[in-house]
């Protein structure tokens, strides 16, 4: 995998020169960063310097800059999102499936929720998946609650805390009590919405299938991989650099700094650790197919 991907970095098209959803050499750099970051865990060889090298290349080349709003990455018009390096295309008309982002929307959605928040699938949700308490608690308590007059979380500090909580319990199950299989046990995650950045449905009442492309590779992950590689000893990186990468991600999440006038979510050098990064990856990358790998690493 590594040798072929390294060869492809010189064969694939220049950044942004390929047609949409086809990989270019930035995708190859990203894949190498991810493989090298996990090399010690799966192969017993420390490759953190190479992980840092390729993650930084993704960032420094600047071809896929961070989106200005975290929430825009997971919407029906995310084909215009600057951050997505390699998307898996979904289309309500031409790529209909119960899998992909159609599942990610409907599995967390149920009929009564449509009275409060538009996810672009109408009342077609299945209500068969909920998030665990351990994940919800990675966000500040004030950011965990859904308010009917703020369905996009504009008034939250961390805009990544996208939960639906009305008439739902936080716990999916309480020890010592009988397990009840209902969609009100546990909060729903409304990160994925089949609507546009203008917060409009593609058609009135929503579509049967999703048009939200799945971001298989995106730049924010490169920021977090670079930071982690540095903390794990990558040669050439500095602690200040790692802190800068993490705070850039948090600035965007909090819509602060160059992203807006929200309350700052920045951390100090003393707060940055591998444990913090693991939690930050959960906050940033949840439901994007990386958590199991992160936990094993």
Predicted segments — roles?
Residues 227:
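Active-site-proximal region of nucleotide-activated glycan assembly enzymes
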Residues 137-219:
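Flexible, polar/acidic helix-loop-strand segments at domain edges
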């Amino acid at each position: 995998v590594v040798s072929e991907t390294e060869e492809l970095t010189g064969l694939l098209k220049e950044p942004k020169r390929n047609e949409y959803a086809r990989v270019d050499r930035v995708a190859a750099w990203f894949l190498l960063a991810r493989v090298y970051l996990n090399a010690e865990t799966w192969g017993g060889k420390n490759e953190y310097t190479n992980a840092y090298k390729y993650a930084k290349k993704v960032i420094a080349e600047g071809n896929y800059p961070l989106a200005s709003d975290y929430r825009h990455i997971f919407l029906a018009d995310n084909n215009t999102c600057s951050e997505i390096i390699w998307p898996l295309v979904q289309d309500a008309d031409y790529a209909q499936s119960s899998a992909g982002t159609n599942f990610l929307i409907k599995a967390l959605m149920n009929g009564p929720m449509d009275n409060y928040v538009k996810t672009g699938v109408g009342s077609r949700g299945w209500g068969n998946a909920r998030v665990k308490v351990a994940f919800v608690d990675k966000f500040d308590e004030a950011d965990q609650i859904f308010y009917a007059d703020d369905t996009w979380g504009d008034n939250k500090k961390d805009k990544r805390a996208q939960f639906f909580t009305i008439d739902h319990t936080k716990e999916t199950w309480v020890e010592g009590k009988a397990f009840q299989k209902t969609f009100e046990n546990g909060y729903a995650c409304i990160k994925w919405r089949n609507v546009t950045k203008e917060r409009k449905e593609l058609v009135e009442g929503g579509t049967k299938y999703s048009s939200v492309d799945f971001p298989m590779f995106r730049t924010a992950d490169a920021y977090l991989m670079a930071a982690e590689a540095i903390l794990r000893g990558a040669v050439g990186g500095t602690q200040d650099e790692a802190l800068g990468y993490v705070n850039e991600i948090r600035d965007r999440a909090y819509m602060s700094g160059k992203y807006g006038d929200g309350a700052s979510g920045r951390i100090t050098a003393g707060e940055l650790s591998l444990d913090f990064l693991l939690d930050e990856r959960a906050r940033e990358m949840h439901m994007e197919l990386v958590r199991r790998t992160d936990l094993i690493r």
